[in-house]
């Protein structure tokens, strides 16, 4: 790029911010040539097949970005805190699955990292905990008050009767959601619901979300079979076309 003319090629992105553009006059990007006003930074967004300039405000809101892009395992790359349910669950079998997953993760963490995964009861979580940690929530909106606080702000809707993913509805009595999402109580941190690390022994790998059909086996273990799974779009919503 020269001081006034910038050229860029992109792949698989729909917005970006250019810096050091105080003398910029044109930006050539993916075949589009944009006339721009010099500024310390320029915000560009793709609208269909073409690029255009945008205000910083137009780029506001939830966006996937470094340290907030998923999938589930990303929440364990920074300080995290497991949150144990203490209330009355909507459905016993789904709650058993959540407790078994928390126990599996705790044992795996001790085995692999020679330490204990930090955990607190949902009734003991403080504002400082929310500010400083990714929260790994186990249970359901009945048993875990943190899940209850954020349930209405998640793209997957979860009530006592159903779990709704876009145009699909699953019975909450025999299904449980797993997901990662920016914490509605602190959008700079994650919440994860009903999953520990998913790349370890005994764990199923997911993207950003999954719905598991749960069933109790003869040995007392509650297994989860993937009924639905996917990746949220760049605005952390369910994509119109599955990614």
Task: Describe every region a protein language model picked out.
Residues 1-12:
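Surface beta-strand/loop "capping" patches
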Residues 7, 15-243:
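Solvent-exposed alpha-helical segments and adjacent loops
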